[in-house]
């Protein structure tokens, strides 16, 4: 059976449980950030979740490429067979779970909620090729388990243990824990939600910052950056170097997210003092490939360079100088640059309308 999918709750959801528990002050900051644009990787992950849910539910799935089917769906289903080799599991896919009155308005969706004998099973699909996600002490899955225990009692009736499973083809990670551990997590979550609504809710940096959308404006991280730029590296001992290296990835992520936030603001016509949108440096392309072939032969270029038509850069290297009028410079998009950059600023539609009006 398949439950209706729902959006994740705003205060905390499965994927944000670790951040909210470790940094309750992040909730208010994230609420003020502009909405995120879904990446192509996220869209692909959503598609794969929908496809595998339909297959398990006995429905006709959306069409996907043969590569995705063979490298993601087939191995994922094979790994599911390791969890349920005898096909004994009672299960639901994409099922909404929540905490009821215990923590109002906090909910999420479990990819697969199941039960075999005295064991409840919480299974999450991960189709990304990046960092391998561990199941042990995974707060996202403990969130789903705690919420399912309150809202889907059938999966916990007579249960003495809970198994958290992450299938991330070609890997599978499994961890069996107790109902008592899920209860302790639930208490942690309750306390964090209570703290999150306070104006002085604590902020704390750590691994949970990785996917936080408020990272670019977080005072904890901006403070760490301020301290880092003042460090005199020649004076650091080996222990201090080790400590700074541990923080480096976090600061790299902060810088990347800050640039992305500023770029998105400029793309939307907002003003970032000292910065502007400019066209990316153009790549030369042939204006007319047929005319380019004729001109290159006349200039002395021979096969196979003409038959396959090499790039303007390669042709120029061989001929020393290209005939005039054969190429055009094409920009691949816009990028952010300081006002001191000599390239002219690109005005977005909203800015153009202001100038006209």
Describe each model-derived feature in a short phrase.
Residues 253-357:
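Extended, charge-rich alpha-helical segments
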Residues 37, 41, 132-134, 237:
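Alpha-helix N-cap/helix-initiation motif
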Residues 56, 127-130, 145-156, 194-197, ...:
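Hydrophobic/aromatic-lined pockets within catalytic cores
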Residues 52, 73, 189, 244-262:
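Short amphipathic alpha-helical coiled-coil/interface segments
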Residues 31-32, 63-67, 89-95, 203-210, ...:
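Short coil/turn segments at secondary-structure boundaries
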Residues 88-194:
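Mg2+/Mn2+-dependent nuclease catalytic core
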Residues 163, 182-250, 346-357:
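Short, charged, low-complexity amphipathic alpha-helix
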Residues 1-120, 248:
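Metal-dependent nuclease catalytic cores that hydrolyze phosphodiester bonds in DNA/RNA
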